[in-house]
A protein has these predicted regions:
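N-terminal binding-site loop/beta-alpha segment at the start of enzyme catalytic domains
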Residues: 1-71, 75, 113, 139, ...
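Glycine/proline-rich, positively charged
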Residues: 20, 87-170
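Short, glycine/acidic-enriched loop or turn micro-motifs at the edges of active sites
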Residues: 44, 79, 124
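Short loop/turn segments at strand-loop or loop-helix junctions that form parts
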Residues: 75-78, 120-121
Length: 170
């Protein structure tokens, strides 16, 4: 089953999640695709994900003839609070730079020139959306406009935060 995103681009109804797979990530991603998964969810968050090992799996799958454009790749930007002290970006940089650095690192890890979906892993603000959330979102919108991601999204939000984002996002 496929859904349609806000920009009329197909969206898979389920994805294989790669959190907490550790050193088994490469093998398990290959097994997931062999078992019928066509969408892979990861994040540039070393405390819980091994995004570079997802990239190794994608390289192995390519050698077996599975083309990049047949797979849906989703990754996420995680703010410094969720990084466990191992941020994939300069934590002293402004948030827009952190988003770009994390995204560029994800492209290298995954061995691709674009992702199908880039998600804000969680808002920085506990209630509502604050200035920091909007700075991150604006950087993500810029990545969308550049064509480096086909869609953007958010996870781990309260209903009110999602409503606010839908009302005010560009």
């Amino acid at each position: 089953m496929s859904l349609t995103a806000y920009n009329h681009v197909p969206l898979p109804s389920f994805m294989y999640g790669t959190a907490w797979k550790k050193e088994a990530t490469t093998q398990l991603v290959q097994l997931a695709v062999a078992s019928g998964f066509t969408a892979i969810d990861t994040a540039n968050q070393l405390i819980h994900y091994q995004e570079a090992l997802v990239g190794e799996a994608l390289q192995a799958l390519a050698k077996k003839g599975i083309k990049r454009d047949t797979l849906f790749l989703q990754t996420k930007f995680t703010s410094i609070d969720g990084q466990g002290g191992r941020a994939p970006y300069d934590s002293s940089a402004n948030l827009a730079t952190q988003v770009r650095q994390s995204f560029d690192s994800s492209l290298v890890h995954l061995g691709t020139e674009y992702v199908d979906s880039y998600v804000l892993h969680a808002p920085i603000s506990r209630r509502g959306l604050g200035a920091a959330d909007w700075e991150v979102w604006a950087a993500m919108e810029e990545l969308y406009r550049s064509g480096k991601t086909k869609r953007i999204g958010i996870s781990n939000v309260a209903a009110g935060q999602l409503a606010q984002l839908c009302e005010q996002a560009n």
